[in-house]
Amino acid sequence: MLVNIIFLDYERHDFTQQVKNHNFSNAGYDFSFTQVEMKGISRALNYGISRSKAFDAIVTMANDILMPDSWLLRMVEAALNIPNTGMCGIHCVEGINPLQTINGIQIHPQDASFGNVLIPMAAIEKIGYFNEAYDPYGMQDSDYAFRLKMTGHINYYLHDLRSEHIGHDVGQDTPYRKMKDEGLSKCDYLWARETQKYHDNNDYTIFLNEYP
């Protein structure tokens, strides 16, 4: 499995080098990477996807999450053994569901997997790109996970692994935090609007013109 990491590095670079040094050295599996400094999480991920067509999977990676040893090896093993993998993640934030075993792989199935996730290109080819309506910051990961689930994919965390979010900035008076708060304030409205649109049209795909 050929993997391309889409490394999101917009605006705040406090932990960029630390995260790259750590996550790139302990992955346990070969990879390529595309570093994107672009406003809007969906827009940045979509640009990365457009540069990943020769790969079998992507990994979405934030510049403030540290991954455990052999994280990519474990992700690849899971995706190869669970053919309908949507988002394969390593638990970082939010809750985690009970353990299940699928094809010998221990996982925690989720509605959405947050943090850094592996997404097979086969899943991307089925549902397309991230929804840029949530940009610059919002529920783009939940939206993508919802569309994956509705098209027969399974989103999950790997068992017995934990990643660490080192970029906590809640309450900070910075332009970056203000951008996030503004995006989050629109989440409920956008989520209701976009998911209703998918249901009404019975269409969970988003295909965009290729990025230059």
Predicted regions and their residues:
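N-proximal low-complexity "stem/linker" segments adjacent to membrane-targeting elements
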Residues: 1-18
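Short, acidic, metal-binding catalytic loop of nucleotide-sugar glycosyltransferases
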Residues: 19-29
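Glycine-rich, basic loop-to-helix element that forms the pyrophosphate-binding segment
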Residues: 36-52
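Short beta-strand-to-loop acidic/aromatic patch adjacent to the donor-nucleotide binding site
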Residues: 55-66
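Conserved donor NDP-sugar-binding/catalytic core segment of glycosyltransferases
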Residues: 70-102
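A recurrent flexible, glycine/aromatic-enriched loop bordering the glycosyltransferase active site
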Residues: 101-121
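Aromatic-glycine-rich donor-binding/catalytic loop that engages nucleotide-sugar donors
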Residues: 119-138, 147-153
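C-terminal catalytic/acceptor-binding lobe
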Residues: 137-212
